[in-house]
């Protein structure tokens, strides 16, 4: 899709660069698959901030997306491709042969009128969902399950994909965009192709207000704070004084935070290894 630069009719428009998507549906979403989305403002049930830089923004409705793709053997036709404010990828509205409609993450190149299918005998075509044991070696995949039947957890954002490198017994070996190589059970499902809207990282919001519309609040540097507010605060001039840490003192660079030893054995190659 082309990148459109806006004319500098105002300071806020001068740096705006947006991706043009002519194939997206212009109307409202499919109402039966839409539900209310309550905002948290980054607070938990006690009212304490647990996620900083979150709050405000335009009201959004949540689109119920099918990540399990468990309607096997029933062909579906893509009715339309839609924008989803809750994710960077686009979504596709499917109409199955029995009349049911579901949203899925739209793969790259999928358009209205295309046919998709899920199941063991689904053809190898972008948008089709199969178990990893039925995928050709070297395939580009997205929406990969980590647990059988749980639903897709890997490679769900715009432009994301993984590559199937091989199979070893009851496990498939995949490589993520980060460089990590890991084992996933061959009965876990994945979708052929990569996720749509791969130009998402090329856009420029152009002004702070565009981020506020999306519910993103300002990020204040620790060095700009007082000593009471952050370990980097205070001092004369721009003086950090210590190695980079979080507001609560945890090391920000090189410190491993992963503690799930149960699934560490599934990681063949760490993403930090160059």
From Swiss-Prot:
InterPro entries, A to Z: NA-bd_OB-fold (IPR012340), Rib_uL2_dom2 (IPR014722), Ribosomal_uL2 (IPR002171), Ribosomal_uL2_bac/org-type (IPR005880), Ribosomal_uL2_C (IPR022669), Ribosomal_uL2_dom3 (IPR014726), Ribosomal_uL2_RNA-bd_dom (IPR022666), Translation_prot_SH3-like_sf (IPR008991)
UniProt keyword RNA-binding present: yes
Keyword Ribosomal protein: yes
Cellular-component GO terms for this entry: large ribosomal subunit
Biased composition (Basic and acidic residues): 229-239
Gene3D superfamilies: 2.30.30.30, Nucleic acid-binding proteins, Ribosomal protein L2, domain 3
GO MF assignments: rRNA binding; structural constituent of ribosome; transferase activity
Domain of life: Bacteria
Subunit structure: Part of the 50S ribosomal subunit. Forms a bridge to the 30S subunit in the 70S ribosome.
Entry function: One of the primary rRNA binding proteins. Required for association of the 30S and 50S subunits to form the 70S ribosome, for tRNA binding and peptide bond formation. It has been suggested to have peptidyltransferase activity; this is somewhat controversial. Makes several contacts with the 16S rRNA in the 70S ribosome.
HAMAP family according to UniProt: Ribosomal_uL2_B (MF_01320_B)
Sequence similarity: Belongs to the universal ribosomal protein uL2 family.
Record-given protein name: Large ribosomal subunit protein uL2
Organism encoding this protein: Acinetobacter baumannii (strain AB0057)
Gene: rplB
